[in-house]
């Protein structure tokens, strides 16, 4: 028996669209207004800095000859499809999990678009303390990390809170 999409976690797919719009919009603004390597200070310890990432998080496999572009694209597609299926199988009232899944899907698709369109991921957020700089990242990465943190948080909540 089929169920209404609004009664499933797919009801939260609108959040994927929001993440994509914000992520791709921010990357578009960077590409239109920055040359590669340009930096603009925003606040103490936070810069906008245009960088290209040919690998994964922390530029993992960035210098691997190009095959990693397709490898990470495949991972993004696989994870996104898996999470959409999980959203379909969950109730719309399971907000925390569905929000987490939507954030991860939105971030994965934002970076997937970059990999397929540009051949690299556009990064622009440079957090630093003194001379130490964290790896440059983007809003898609942030959405993925927040989504993953919500999944971990959900694991620590009492079962009554999980059902809501």
Curated annotation (Swiss-Prot):
<feature type="active site">
    <location>
        <position position="141"/>
    </location>
</feature>
<comment type="pathway">
    <text>Protein modification; lipoprotein biosynthesis (signal peptide cleavage).</text>
</comment>
<keyword id="KW-0378">Hydrolase</keyword>
<dbReference type="Pfam" id="PF01252">
    <property type="entry name" value="Peptidase_A8"/>
</dbReference>
<comment type="similarity">
    <text>Belongs to the peptidase A8 family.</text>
</comment>
<dbReference type="GO" id="GO:0004190">
    <property type="term" value="F:aspartic-type endopeptidase activity"/>
</dbReference>
<feature type="transmembrane region" description="Helical">
    <location>
        <begin position="70"/>
        <end position="90"/>
    </location>
</feature>
<feature type="transmembrane region" description="Helical">
    <location>
        <begin position="12"/>
        <end position="32"/>
    </location>
</feature>
<dbReference type="GO" id="GO:0005886">
    <property type="term" value="C:plasma membrane"/>
</dbReference>
<keyword id="KW-0472">Membrane</keyword>
<feature type="active site">
    <location>
        <position position="123"/>
    </location>
</feature>
<dbReference type="InterPro" id="IPR001872">
    <property type="entry name" value="Peptidase_A8"/>
</dbReference>
<keyword id="KW-1003">Cell membrane</keyword>
<comment type="function">
    <text>This protein specifically catalyzes the removal of signal peptides from prolipoproteins.</text>
</comment>
<keyword id="KW-0645">Protease</keyword>
<keyword id="KW-0812">Transmembrane</keyword>
<keyword id="KW-0997">Cell inner membrane</keyword>
<keyword id="KW-1133">Transmembrane helix</keyword>
<keyword id="KW-0064">Aspartyl protease</keyword>
<feature type="transmembrane region" description="Helical">
    <location>
        <begin position="137"/>
        <end position="157"/>
    </location>
</feature>
<dbReference type="GO" id="GO:0006508">
    <property type="term" value="P:proteolysis"/>
</dbReference>
<feature type="transmembrane region" description="Helical">
    <location>
        <begin position="102"/>
        <end position="122"/>
    </location>
</feature>
<protein>
    <recommendedName>
        <fullName>Lipoprotein signal peptidase</fullName>
        <ecNumber>3.4.23.36</ecNumber>
    </recommendedName>
</protein>
């Amino acid at each position: 028996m089929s169920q209404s999409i609004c009664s499933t976690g797919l009801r939260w797919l609108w959040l994927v669209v929001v993440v994509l719009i914000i992520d791709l919009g921010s990357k578009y603004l960077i590409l239109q207004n920055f040359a590669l390597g340009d930096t603009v200070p925003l606040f103490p310890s936070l810069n906008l800095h245009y960088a290209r990432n040919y690998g994964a998080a922390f530029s993992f496999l960035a210098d691997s000859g190009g095959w990693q572009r397709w490898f990470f694209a495949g991972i993004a597609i696989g994870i996104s499809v898996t999470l959409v299926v999980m959203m379909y199988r969950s109730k719309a009232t399971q907000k925390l999990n569905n929000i987490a899944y939507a954030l991860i899907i939105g971030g994965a698709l934002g970076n997937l678009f970059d990999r397929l369109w540009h051949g690299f991921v556009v990064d622009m957020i440079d957090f630093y303390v003194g001379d130490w700089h964290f790896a440059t990242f983007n809003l898609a990465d942030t959405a993925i990390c927040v989504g993953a943190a919500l999944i971990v948080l959900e694991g620590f909540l009492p079962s009554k809170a999980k059902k809501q």
